[in-house]
């Protein structure tokens, strides 16, 4: 009888562990981390992170985003907009480079909580940001 109980217990554990979820490599985004980082990141030739953050805010507003949070100390800006009735969220971080001669900006966009991996979206954002920084540096408002 004890052998039957042990066999049933072992079979039960096997069935339960078979229902457990497995870790998917996509959860950590291991597929294309380097590719994603390269399309989401640009370096700008200014050491003033606050100017970059102000221009990030202006650029997002120019692109019809509503600023949800902005923290110049941390160098983060979060914004949302509606596109075809769905929510697009963009989070942008700015940090000084290791040499303190440039500022590195990384943008992360989501469409309905799914990451946007279309390079054109990021190219358009960084192009607008670059123009804004140029105009700001040359005192054109």
Label each PLM-derived region with a short phrase.
Residues 15-18:
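C-terminal motif of bacterial Sec signal peptides marking the signal peptidase cleavage site
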Residues 20-141:
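Ser/Thr-rich, low-complexity intrinsically disordered terminal regions
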């Amino acid at each position: 009888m004890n052998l039957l109980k042990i066999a049933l217990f072992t079979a039960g554990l096997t069935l339960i562990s078979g229902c457990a979820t497995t870790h998917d490599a996509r959860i950590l985004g291991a597929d294309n981390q380097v590719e994603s980082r390269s399309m989401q990141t640009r370096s700008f030739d200014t050491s003033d992170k606050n100017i970059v953050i102000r221009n990030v805010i202006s650029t997002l507003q120019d692109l019809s985003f509503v600023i949800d949070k902005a923290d110049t100390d941390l160098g983060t800006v979060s914004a949302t907009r509606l596109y075809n009735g769905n929510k697009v969220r963009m989070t942008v971080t700015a940090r000084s480079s290791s040499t303190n001669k440039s500022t590195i900006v990384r943008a992360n966009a989501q469409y309905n909580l799914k990451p946007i991996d279309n390079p054109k979206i990021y190219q358009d954002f960084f192009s607008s940001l670059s123009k804004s920084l140029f105009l700001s540096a040359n005192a054109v408002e």
